[in-house]
């Protein structure tokens, strides 16, 4: 994660959303 954008999402999606956000 860049900004930990997936706090309520699974860690796999957290990594993806961390890059997007």
UniProtKB/Swiss-Prot annotation:
GO terms for biological process: cell adhesion. It is found in: Secreted. It comes from the Eukaryota. Signal peptide: none annotated. GO terms for cellular component: extracellular region. Keywords: Cell adhesion, Secreted. Plays a role in adherence of C.albicans to buccal epithelial cells, and in biofilm formation. This is Complement receptor 3-related protein.
